[in-house]
Amino acid sequence: TLRALSPAALFAPTRADCDLIDQHATWRAIADFRPTLVFHLAGRVAGLGGNLAFTGQAYFENAQINLNVVEGARRAGAAKIVAAGTTAVYSDKAPMPMREDDIEIGPPHGSEAPYAHAKRGMLAMLEAYRTQYGLPFAYMVCTNLYGPNDRFDEVHGHVVPSLISRFHRTQQAGEKQIVCWGDGTPTRDFLYAADAAAAFVTAAESGQGAYNTATGQAQPIRD
């Protein structure tokens, strides 16, 4: 999606190129490239099981990555940041349909609270940097994404890749029953990754502030 816009240069580092938890390595990498536009998509992401098992890591690593990337972008003179948020920032107390102004209503759900608080903190940081430094941003509140190159892992993956992994493992083992949490009635909004990428590009061109990034269609998990 980005390459279709024919940018003069595109730098998409992997973890092997730069550990974003390392402050100085992150600042150095961003300073060396001196980007005009920064898409901040990095984070320590897990499914329900991983979020419950690694609460400290979820908060520390996400908060540290966000601090390093946003400050590094400011130091390097970036003109704008487009950052990936999450619907986990919303509380169960938020009215439906959820609106961007409701992000601070009540605490996040306990199952994802550390991860969600780190993501809320990034929004607060971006707002503070816009106020003090005049750094524009778009904060994309992403729903459940799925698509190529996902993490097909029952601990670290989201709903769709976790279920695919579980079905595949069960089939490979020759088992006849699949054990899933709950009764499948909870609903989620699932968004294809390429559609999310297109929304990010649109936000980079003209967006300011927080945006819910979703289809607007709720689907029961069992479907």
What label would you give each PLM region?
Residues 68, 92, 110-143, 162-173:
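Active-site Tyr-X1-5-Lys
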Residues 19, 89-91, 114, 138-162, ...:
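Flexible, glycine-rich beta-alpha linker
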Residues 131, 145-148, 160-178, 188-212:
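Alpha-helical substrate-binding/gating segment
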